[in-house]
From Swiss-Prot:
Binding locations of ATP: G112, T113, H114, G115, K116, T117, T118
Organism of this sequence: Janthinobacterium sp. (strain Marseille) (Minibacterium massiliensis)
Superkingdom in the source lineage: Bacteria
Lineage: Bacteria, Pseudomonadati, Pseudomonadota, Betaproteobacteria, Burkholderiales
Subcellular location: Cytoplasm
Keyword Glycoprotein in annotation: no
Gene: murC
Pfam families: Mur_ligase, Mur_ligase_C, Mur_ligase_M
Protein name: UDP-N-acetylmuramate--L-alanine ligase
GO cellular component, one term: cytoplasm
GO BP terms: cell division; cell wall organization; peptidoglycan biosynthetic process; regulation of cell shape
Length: 465
């Protein structure tokens, strides 16, 4: 019966998770249309590939649709969703459509609170170098491919598994990765951390009896749930009990150099073209999967050495010219952009920057993402943001939420001043952030723009300044 479905419409097609699935379906021969509130690189790419993309949501957009795909960001009162219900057009959640794609291949699903996008990209890159030509769907732009999705000819599909709405429980992969488990998106789990842990355990139960769970043993919560997992397990990380273990990791010129030990294999010397100890862990997950699937170590080493990263994951813009202004001399500053929006991610990025740019002053421009996250992790944000040398703090990016008292940017800035380790410069409007940064920085600084909201447009303006 599925041959009757030819036209698939995406509500919110420009989203990172939606656009990748849309691209794979285009390459499978489906007619794809979609709508979004604005244009971005993803929508422009899909148009070039043959999709019909409309700006704005309207009932007439779905006139020819045999099915529509929605993400959790799409509300029930969306006019296209209402029209689909009235016409009895199937409404398919994004994760269910991803699960359908996974049924066409052997799935490799990457889960965890942090590191999903980079780990998925590393796995896809390693398998591609090993000749397996995987299909992949990633939540960010894989720089080497120039896309966040690709239809491969091989038997595997590599995809992120999203725990934010528990939709990863729709997937049925043969290999799973759990990078870590932290308190985030707790509204999905009734603000009960035990329910979040149980969801990850249930995720591993989606594996077939011959499947394998690849787990980061460095993470305390992952270690805690391991006895409750009834599938084959391969562990990785720095921990002395890790089956795929990284040792002697050090940062040299923005690369991570380390050795990987695993029983039955010769020690592997790795030079990873990404900074940060967290990326060493992510690379170990890719190494574990590569060996599970028979990829030669030399191919894995080559892929990791040549890995160009993912869009907005410690994206390095290089040294940017800093013009002379008044009594401030001309010079240069290094610019890095990152999607991180959780205290753990922020800490990892700061640590990576310290390793990649030793001895240089670190200026962090941070935009909190969601009032609920700011409220739930307020003290953690104060602790982590206090570790930078200078902080430019934006107002919270709401992401559709209503403001919460004492969970806004000004309150966070005040708490940071009271803590006494950093004196943040608060910026109410993100449009004012580039000028604020340029006024603060000096020759030799390292600037990190960070957050999952509208701060993504700031780096381009800094480059043009």
């Amino acid at each position: 019966m599925k041959h009757k479905v030819k036209n698939i419409h995406f509500v919110g097609i420009g989203g990172s998770g939606m656009s990748g699935i849309a691209e794979v379906l285009l390459n499978l021969g489906y007619t794809v249309s979609g709508s979004d509130l604005g244009s971005n690189a993803a929508t422009r790419r899909l148009i070039e590939l043959g999709a019909k993309v409309t700006l704005g949501h309207a009932a007439e957009n779905i006139e020819k649709a045999d099915a529509i795909v929605t993400s959790t960001a799409v509300k029930e009162d969306n006019p296209e969703v209402i029209a689909a219900r009235e016409k009895h057009i199937p409404i398919v959640p994004r994760a269910v459509m991803l699960a359908e794609l996974m049924r066409l291949r052997r799935g490799i699903a990457i889960a965890g609170t942090h590191g999903k996008t980079t780990t998925t990209s590393l796995v896809a890159s390693v398998l591609a170098e090993g000749g397996l030509d995987p299909t992949f769907v990633i939540g960010g732009l894989l720089n080497s491919a120039g896309a966040n999705a690709k239809l491969g000819t091989g038997e595997f599909i590599v995809a992120e598994a999203d725990e934010s709405d528990a939709s990863f429980l729709n997937l049925s992969p043969v290999i799973e990765v759990i990078t870590n488990i932290d308190a985030d998106h707790m509204e999905t789990y009734g603000h009960d951390f035990e329910k979040l842990k149980q969801a990850f355990i249930e995720f591993t139960q989606r594996l077939p009896f011959y499947g394998v769970a690849v787990l980061c043993i460095d993470d305390a919560t992952v270690r805690e749930i391991m006895p409750r997992i009834s599938k084959l397990i391969t562990t990785y990380g720095f921990h002395e009990d890790a089956q795929v273990r990284a040792i002697d990791a050090k940062a040299i010129d923005g690369h991570m150099h380390f050795t990987v030990l695993q029983e039955g294999y010769a020690p592997m010397q790795v030079s990873l073209n990404q900074p940060g100890m967290h990326n060493v862990q992510n690379a170990c997950a890719a190494i574990a999967i590569a060996r599970e699937l028979g990829v030669a170590d030399h191919a894995t080493q080559k892929a990791l050495t040549e890995f160009n990263g993912v869009g907005r994951r410690f994206t390095r813009y290089g040294e940017i010219s800093l013009p002379a202004v008044n009594d401030k001399p001309a010079g240069t500053f290094a610019l890095v952009d990152d999607y991180g929006h959780h205290p753990v991610e922020t800490a990892a990025t700061i640590a990576a920057a310290r390793g990649a740019y030793p001895g240089r002053r670190l200026v962090l421009a941070f935009q909190p993402h969601r009032y609920t996250r700011t409220r739930d992790l307020f003290e953690d944000f104060v602790k982590v943001l206090s570790t930078t040398d200078m902080l430019v703090l934006a107002e919270v990016y709401a992401a559709g939420e209503q403001p919460i008292v004492a969970a806004d940017g000004r309150t966070l800035a005040h708490a940071l001043r009271v803590a006494g380790k950093v004196d943040p410069v608060f910026v109410e409007k993100i449009a004012d952030m580039p000028a604020t940064i340029m006024n603060i920085i000096k020759d030799g600084d390292v600037v990190i723009t960070m957050g999952a909201g509208s701060i993504s447009g700031v780096p381009a303006k800094l480059v043009q300044a």
